[in-house]
Curated annotation (Swiss-Prot):
Native organism taxonomy: Eukaryota, Viridiplantae, Streptophyta, Embryophyta, Tracheophyta
SUPFAM superfamilies linked: F-box domain, Galactose oxidase, central domain
Segments forming domain F-box: 26-81
Protein name from the UniProt record: F-box protein At3g56470
Region Disordered, annotated ranges: 1-24
Length: 367
């Protein structure tokens, strides 16, 4: 009987020692120094951040304070041969491969508010597509040329969503087509052509402050105000150095930015004065990060200054056989010569992921 009691006491003491060790280990993780805890949590993706916030009160407060609400755009790549797509998150350097059979034969035209505008050149079919929810909103058919640009004002779920494109440019006239969501047909407007004769095509279209800004390949900027059905060509041109092989135009909180790219020179950053409608060269992006692609670009006032994602131009590149992104620092101290090669505009485009991404099935397939 004595030996049994002793063995039971030994087992209890062992269990107490084990439980005390586990508690010490648990307490060690909970009582991490504040700066170390924030450093660890700052490197977690949103999904793991939410999980970590359930550990204890201290972790919850740290996770919530560092949780990124305004996520960075993702880059979506389109296959030339099949219906496979690749989504790439540059902030976490993660990607996922997707298949959308319903988009077979379609090419991308524009991206805004988490939606893609897709066009089928064989059937002339237009549709809005959300790659995160797979929601699809069909539009009336419209013939489009290969290099024709199209844009829309906001998500198609809004009644104020407006599609815009220039369908024809002759010596005397320019034809514009617009379409409001839930309308029955396209609206056609014809204006006198005031563009210069060396005009070839529109390269960039941006919607801001209720107006569509349209940039031609020669640098002319035209405005279309849908509320007034008014078309105007501005007289000035942006300062452009010889040797430019492409440009990107975007907006941020009503301000219009234009970036000219060069093969063997650093980019030129310009900002439009909305009072005089003249372009002014800038040596900095003012803290913005511009995610640039040929058909549409995104801009964000990034908060990750300590990580270097600040005052940058983010571009899609091929590194070896891997698709990735590079950040080019735009400021007065930038002395590194940036070499950029123009890509096929229909290969990729930036898109904003939804804030409830964690609740979608797509989130669990990220690798």
């Amino acid at each position: 009987m004595v030996t049994r009691r002793r063995s039971k006491k030994k087992k209890k003491t062992k269990r107490k020692k084990q439980s005390s060790k586990e508690k010490e280990k648990y307490q060690t993780f909970i009582n991490l120094p504040c700066d170390l805890l924030q450093l660890v949590i700052s490197r977690l993706p949103l999904k793991d951040n939410i999980r970590a916030s359930a550990v204890c009160k201290t972790w919850h407060e740290a996770c919530v304070s560092l949780r990124v609400i305004h996520t960075s755009p993702w880059l979506i790549y389109f296959s030339k041969t099949d219906d496979s797509y690749e989504l790439y998150d540059p902030s976490m350097q993660k990607n996922c491969n997707l298949h959308f059979p319903e988009l077979s034969g379609f090419r991308v035209c524009y991206s805004k508010d988490g939606w893609l505008l897709m066009y089928n050149p064989n059937s002339y079919q237009l549709l809005f597509f959300n790659p995160f929810t797979r929601d699809c909103v069909p539009m009336p058919t419209l013939w489009m040329a290969y290099d024709q640009r199209m844009a829309f004002s906001c998500a198609p779920t809004s009644t104020s969503c407006l599609l815009f494109t220039v369908t024809s440019v002759t010596w005397n006239y320019i034809t514009i087509k617009t379409y409001f969501a839930n309308a029955k047909e396209w609206k056609t407007s014809v204006f006198k052509n005031r563009l210069q004769r060396n005009f070839n095509t529109f390269e960039q279209i941006v919607f801001s402050n209720g107006v569509f800004y349209c940039l031609t390949n020669t640098g002319c900027l035209a405005l279309f105000d849908p509320s007034l059905n008014y078309w105007n060509v501005l007289p000035g041109r942006p300062p452009k150095r010889p040797g430019s092989n492409g440009c990107f135009m975007t907006e941020h909180q009503g301000e219009i930015f234009l970036i000219y790219m060069y093969r063997h020179m650093n980019p030129t950053v310009l900002k439009l004065d909305l009072t005089s409608f003249e372009w002014a060269e800038r040596k900095t992006l003012g803290g913005l990060t511009i995610y640039a692609s040929a058909l549409s670009s995104e801009s964000r006032a990034e908060q990750q200054k300590q990580s270097g994602i600040w005052n940058c131009l983010c571009l899609s590149v091929f590194h070896g056989f891997k698709r990735t992104c590079i950040y080019y620092k735009v400021d007065e101290e930038s002395e590194v010569c940036f070499k950029w090669k123009k890509q096929n505009p229909y290969e990729n485009i930036w898109i904003m992921p939804p804030l409830n991404l964690i609740d979608l099935p797509l989130f669990d397939h990220r690798i």
